[in-house]
Swiss-Prot record:
It comes from the Archaea. It comes from Archaeoglobus fulgidus (strain ATCC 49558 / DSM 4304 / JCM 9628 / NBRC 100126 / VC-16). ATP binds at T63, G64, K65, T66, A67, Y206, R218. The keyword ATP-binding applies. Pfam families: AAA_16, Cdc6_C, Cdc6_lid. The gene is cdc6-1. This is ORC1-type DNA replication protein 1. One of its GO terms (molecular function) is ATP binding.
Length: 409
């Protein structure tokens, strides 16, 4: 018997799990009608032979920005085909396509130019973009998702795109930039700001009731009838509403809850599965975040994980003493205590730890903190870094010294 026969013969929960993923764009977007109409109005000159102003879309993660833009873009392409107009949309995720060269090469290749993804001078690629657009006479909407990532690493690409229309005769480009950061324009060069000529649309967070509507809509497409226990959707919506009204978080919670139920061979998705999903998502987020941290932040967290096994709360001074000793074991020079305080603030913002400033009376003030992550899970994630793997050899010694506050080897 095939090993999958038993799995496939069991009752299924999912009808189509892909509709719960971030990449899915639904046919309808509940509670974003105002933003859809606003964006459609701003892009409508494309269908009348004109060039719209550039558009910036702002809002926190999970507020429907990308889904709304892609929804309107799809409608724009459909309307242009009906009217037999030469209008195109090109989507670029600037977290992945993050250099001026790659942005321009991506655009050139979209319109038929055989530009390699590396190797040419950027100016040459820019000229190829112009030639490709002029050959086709295309009016293009360029969607730059996470545009703030591009601004930080390659703002000359944005400058090139903002000035390109003055060099085109038969075609044009409209930029639609999407960002979680409402202040990212503060980092733009003055020459880019002056050439942007942009409109802005702000996406507010969803509330619990709106998130519930979104989940109900997706659940009908994602699940077989009758597999969701009462209260599952409401709980997912309520938890996500606390996280700044994040629809992505709500959808992830519902999907992971169902996957947990599926793995447990349960025919229903229950409230208890949602609670397990919350813990799993938080752990996965923490592990992924830890993997991307610089080495000193990792050593700092390793120090905290050792102390916290017997002392859940600890101070900056206590952590710094252990941190310095670990730096010696890893073979890196320790940072100053002031810089370590900055790193602690960054870790606090990431949600890996929680810190408060407390008064020590005449001894001044210090920061008291506790880890929000399980120290064993945290240490396992940290030890994926080859530089920290050798610390396992000293774990017993380090724990003993950390817990006794005897910071000498």
């Amino acid at each position: 018997m095939n090993i999958f026969d038993n799995i496939l013969s069991s009752a299924t929960i999912f009808k189509n799990r892909d509709v719960l993923r971030h990449s899915y764009t639904p046919e309808k977007l509940p509670h974003r009608e105002e933003q859809i109409n606003q964006l459609a109005l701003l892009l409508s000159p494309m269908l009348r032979g004109g060039t719209p102003s550039n558009i910036f879309i702002y809002g926190k993660t999970g507020t429907g920005k990308t889904a709304t833009v892609l929804f309107v873009a799809r409608q724009l392409e459909e309307a242009s085909r009906k009217a037999k107009l030469n209008v195109a949309v090109h989507y670029i995720n600037c977290e992945i396509v993050d250099t001026a060269y790659r942005v321009l090469a991506s655009l050139a290749r979209k319109f038929g130019s055989n530009v390699p993804m590396t190797g040419w001078p950027t100016d040459q690629v820019y000229e190829e973009v112009k030639k490709a657009l002029e050959r086709r006479g295309t009016r293009v909407v360029v969607i730059l998702d996470e545009i703030d990532k591009l601004v930080k690493k390659a703002e000359e690409a944005l400058y090139g795109l903002t000035r390109i229309n003055s060099e085109l005769e038969n075609s044009s480009i409209c930029i639609v930039g999407i960002s979680n950061n409402l202040k990212f324009k503060e980092y733009l060069d003055a020459r880019i700001l002056s050439s942007l000529s942009e409109e802005e649309i702000v996406f507010p967070p969803y509330n619990a009731e709106q998130l519930e509507d979104i989940l109900q809509q997706r659940a009908k497409l994602a699940f077989e009838d009758g597999v969701l226990e009462d209260g599952v959707i409401q709980l997912c919506a309520a938890i996500a509403a606390q996280e700044h009204g994040d629809a992505r978080k709500a959808l992830d919670l519902l999907r992971v809850s169902a996957e947990i139920a599926e793995r447990e061979r349960d025919s229903m998705v229950r409230v208890e599965h949602v609670k397990k999903a919350v813990r799993k998502i938080e752990t996965d987020y923490m592990i992924e975040t830890v993997r991307t941290l610089p080495v000193h932040s990792k050593i700092l967290l390793y120090s905290m994980s050792l102390i916290s096994e017997n002392s859940p709360k600890f101070t900056t001074g206590e952590v710094y003493c252990v941190y310095k000793k670990l730096c010696g074991k890893v073979g890196v020079d320790p940072l100053t205590q002031r810089r370590i305080s900055d790193l602690i603030s960054e870790l606090d913002m990431l949600g890996i730890l929680n810190s408060v400033v407390i008064s020590k009376g005449r001894y001044g003030r210090t920061r008291e903190m506790k880890l929000e992550a399980d120290e064993k899970v945290l240490r396992k994630a940290l030890e994926e870094d080859y530089r920290l793997q050798n610390l396992r050899k000293f774990e017993g010694e380090l724990k003993k010294l950390a817990n006794l506050n005897l910071f000498q080897f």
